[in-house]
């Protein structure tokens, strides 16, 4: 158990660093616990990977305590315990933020898949620190889910250092819809065709085709460009995104985080729909 004095010193240091970090962002911006809760428990769906799952859903009292999320020939990916009961309690707010947004731990080591760092690099400073603020006060869980194993080389970094990302104005707009569907909810990570180096955003954005393996069997991320979405009304598409229910009443398969997306506001859901409607129409799998 870490001492109270040690934790207070850690929080003080983190606060000073975070204030300096935020000073590089949008003038007058202010991260909030409420925003952090909304993002983590809503569209960002952090618990979809970081909360252990049982036969009936999330395991009680194990929120964000970590679990294995993918096992294949290339790697066994284990989502870390990100509660205050884990090693992240020893990290400053800026260090935790950097791990989330850039995939770099305080010791300089790289976090591997399945975290979508190509998109997370676009999380705004304000939203990032709001999420960190919320993660600092979730119940601490003493649980070690294990370590990821990679049979592929990891990059030295996922790009140049992220200095600052400005806030995207909220509203039912293409810009905010792209931000929600990209950096926040990472819809375009799972639904973009993968190549040897990962999602092919430049040529296959939203074309689908990636296979997911889990207790439910195998599910394939569908094409979310107008090629497939044009057949659905906005209301039908909203039910599919937030309820996991097709127009014919059929339930959709995991791992899409329907329980988290259900907590999105109507405005945010509408912004995502607006953005998806604007994508270039592509054939399934980008073929």
What are the roles of these predicted feature ranges?
Residues 195-199:
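Small-residue-rich helix-loop
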Residues 231-233, 239-286:
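C-terminal functional regions that serve as terminal interaction/effector modules
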Residues 13, 19-27:
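C-terminal segment of classical bacterial N-terminal signal peptides
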Residues 142-154:
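Extended, well-folded interaction surfaces typified by the phenylalanyl-tRNA synthetase beta subunit core
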Residues 44, 66-97, 118-128, 204-240, ...:
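Electron-transfer interface patches adjacent to heme c in soluble/periplasmic c-type cytochromes
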Residues 36, 43-53, 131, 177-180, ...:
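The canonical Cys-X-X-Cys-His
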Residues 2-15:
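Bacterial N-terminal signal peptides that target proteins for export
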Residues 25-42, 155-183:
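Electrostatic cytochrome c docking/interface patches
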């Amino acid at each position: 158990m870490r001492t109270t004095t040690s934790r207070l010193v850690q929080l003080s240091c983190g606060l000073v660093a975070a204030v300096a970090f935020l000073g590089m962002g949008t003038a007058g911006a202010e991260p909030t616990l409420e925003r952090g809760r909304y993002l983590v428990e809503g569209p960002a769906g952090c618990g979809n990977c970081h909360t252990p799952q049982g036969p009936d859903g999330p395991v009680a009292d194990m929120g964000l305590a970590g679990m294995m999320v993918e096992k294949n020939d290339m790697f066994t990916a284990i989502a870390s315990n990100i509660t205050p009961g884990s090693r992240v309690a020893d990290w400053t707010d800026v260090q935790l933020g950097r791990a989330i947004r850039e995939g770099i731990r305080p010791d300089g080591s790289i976090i591997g898949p399945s975290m979508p760092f190509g998109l997370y690099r676009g999380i705004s400073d304000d939203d990032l620190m709001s999420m960190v603020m919320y993660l600092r006060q979730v119940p601490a869980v003493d649980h070690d889910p294990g370590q990821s194993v990679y049979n592929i080389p990891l990059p030295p970094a996922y790009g140049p250092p992220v200095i600052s990302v400005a806030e995207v104005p909220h509203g039912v707009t293409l810009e905010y819809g792209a931000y929600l569907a990209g950096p926040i909810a990472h819809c375009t990570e799972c639904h973009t065709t993968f190549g040897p180096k990962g999602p092919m955003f430049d040529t296959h954005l939203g074309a689908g085709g990636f296979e997911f393996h889990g207790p439910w069997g195998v599910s394939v991320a569908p094409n979310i460009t107008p090629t497939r979405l044009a057949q659905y009304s906005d209301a039908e598409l909203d039910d599919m995104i937030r309820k996991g229910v097709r127009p014919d009443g059929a339930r959709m398969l995991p791992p899409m985080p329907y329980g988290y997306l259900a907590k999105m506001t109507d405005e945010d859901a509408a912004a995502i729909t607006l953005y998806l409607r604007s994508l270039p129409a592509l054939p399934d799998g980008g073929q």
